[in-house]
């Protein structure tokens, strides 16, 4: 079975002045804040007619304060996220492992439970991080394994 990417779910960017960047994307593109933290702001870039869009994860532009040193394992900075179905998730995770890719899995919990999702991250040959994310309304209640 071939992977079927449904949508781009998220784009993460580092910015030099977070308040200025947020204001720009709000004023120029009309994006709305979904969640805001001191060094990270999630802006809704569109609605999706998909499990993630209807299940609590709209298309997002995520802005990160460039001055703050981030723990990449705990953030979603500098990556592209592609939505896949929950039915494909485990099969794709196994296929990527068989291809020899180093994977990191994240079940979105705690302050990110609102995402209602699980993700697998891996790098392309140039070191760009790719995320496959699937809507999973039960993810927040599951024990993190990796």
Features from the language model and the residues they span:
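N-terminal beta-strand motif that seeds the catalytic metal site of vicinal oxygen chelate
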Residues: 1-19, 80, 136-146
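Short glycine-enriched loop/turn motifs at secondary-structure junctions
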Residues: 4-7, 73-77, 113-114
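Short aromatic/hydrophobic contact patches that present stacked aromatics
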Residues: 10-12, 42, 79-81, 119-121
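Amphipathic alpha-helical segments
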Residues: 17-32
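Vicinal oxygen chelate
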Residues: 18, 81-126
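Short secondary-structure junctions
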Residues: 30-36, 102-106
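Conserved short beta-strand elements that form part of the metal-binding/catalytic scaffold
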Residues: 32-74, 86, 129-134
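Short beta->alpha transition motifs characteristic of CBS
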Residues: 113-115, 133-139
């Amino acid at each position: 079975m071939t992977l079927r990417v449904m949508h781009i779910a998220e784009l993460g960017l580092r910015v030099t002045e977070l308040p200025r960047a947020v204001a720009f994307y709000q004023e120029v593109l009309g994006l709305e804040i979904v969640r805001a933290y001191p060094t990270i702001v999630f802006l809704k870039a569109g609605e999706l007619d998909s499990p993630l869009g209807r299940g609590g994860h709209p298309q997002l532009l995520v802005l990160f304060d460039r001055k703050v040193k981030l723990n990449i394992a705990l953030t979603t900075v500098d990556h592209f996220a592609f939505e896949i179905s929950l039915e494909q998730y485990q099969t794709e995770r196994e296929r990527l492992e068989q291809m020899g890719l180093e994977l990191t899995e994240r079940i979105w919990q705690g302050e990110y439970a609102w995402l209602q999702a699980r993700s697998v991250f891996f790098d392309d040959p140039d070191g760009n991080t790719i995320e496959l994310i699937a809507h999973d309304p039960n993810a927040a209640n599951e024990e993190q394994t990796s």
